[in-house]
Amino acid sequence: MNKERKHIVFLARWYPHRYDPMFGLFVQRHAEAAALFNDITVVYSQQTTDNGQQTLSTDNQQTVRTYCIRPFEIVRTLENNVDTIRIYYKKPKNKILSLLRFYRANMIGLRLGRKDGRGEPRPYDLIHVHILTRLGVIAWIQKLLHKTPYIITEHWSRYLPGNDFGGFIRKLATKIVVRNAKLVTTVTDNLAKAMQNHGLKNDNYVVLPNVVNLDMFHISKKNTDATSHVPTIIHVSCFEDKSKNISGLLESLKIVEQKGIDFQCTLIGEGMDFDLMKTKAEELQLINKVSFTGLLEGQKLADELASGDFLVLSSNYENMPVVILEALASGLPVVSTNVGGIKEMIDETKGILVEPRNKEALAEAIIKMIETHNDYDPDYLRKSVIEKYGYESVGKFLDSIYNK
C-alpha cells in the first residue's frame, strides 16, 4: 500500500527567478528531490526595479496562472512536479515599507498555495523554511495561528567566524524561531556547530545533503598524452570576490605561470565583480592563460566541467559548494581552501586542501595537482557522490524527516 503524500510548503529566501536563474538553485533541487515522495509547493518573493512582466523560462515548466494583486505580480508555474509561486513586487524606497511588503508577499503566496491550480483546498502538513530569519518568523506565526509545524534548512554561511550575524533583534528572533522548529537541518556539520555556538538551540540538528543531477554531470574521456595535453583548470563561482576570492586565485595562477608551468584555466560564472576580475587578469598578463565564459547552466555547465582536469576553489569562507559535488560527479579531483564544511567532503583521495588567504600555498597545490591529477580515479570520485547526493537519495532522506 502506497504511503500518503504530505503537502509541504517551501518558504524560500533564495530561489531561481526571472532576473537570476542560478540564485538558490540548490534550494530548487531540494524541492525537486522532495517532490519525488511528497507534494511540494514553493513560495518565493522577489523585489524588482522594473515594471515589466516576464516569466522565467525553464525546462519542464507549465504556467498555471499569472495575475496581479497590486502592487504584486504573481507567477504560478509547475516545474518538475513542484508547484512554484513567485511573487514579484517593486522595491520601495522606505525600509519599513519594504519589510512590510516582503511579509505581505509571502503571506499571499502561502494563502494561494493552500489551494491547488484548480482551486481545490489543500492544507499544509508542514512548512519547510529555507534560510533565516524573516521567513522563520512567518513560519513561527503560522505555527501559533494554525498549529502547522515547521522545520528549517539553513544554507547561509553568515554564522561562520568572520561573517556578519549580529544585531540584538535579529539574534533574539532567530533564537525563538530555531527553538520552536520541529527540526533544523544544515548542509554541513560545521554550519550546525556554528549556529549552536551563537546560541541557536534545538534538540534536533540534522545534516541534509545537497543534490547533484547525476544524469547531467558525467565523466568524459580525455586525451591526456603527456607530450601534448595542456592541463585544464576549472573554477566556478558567483564572482563575488570578498567571499570567493577570485583575485587570490588569479594571483596564484600568476605564480604558477612564472614557474614555467603550462596550463589553461576556465572561469565560469558571473556576478558583481566579473568585470573587475577580467581587468585583474589583464593586469596580471594572464589573458593567454585564462578564459571567462560567463554564466553557464545545465548541460553546458556539465560539459564544461567534464572537459576539465580538476576544479579549483579559492574561497575565504564557504559552506558546502554544490560545484564540488558536481566536479566529483564528473570525475574531477578538487583543489580548495579549507573553509566551511569542505573538509567534510574532500580528503586526500579526492583532492588537496590548503589554508585560505595564502596564494603561495594555493599555487603549490595547483602545481601538485597539475602533476598528479591523473593519479585520481574518476570512477571512485563519482561513486563518492552517487550514493548520498542523488535526487532519489536526498528525496528519501527528506521524506524521513517530514515523517518524524
Label for each model-derived stretch:
Residues 1-71:
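N-terminal subdomain of nucleotide-sugar transferases
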Residues 348, 352-359, 368-374:
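Conserved acidic donor-binding segment of nucleotide-sugar-dependent glycosyltransferases
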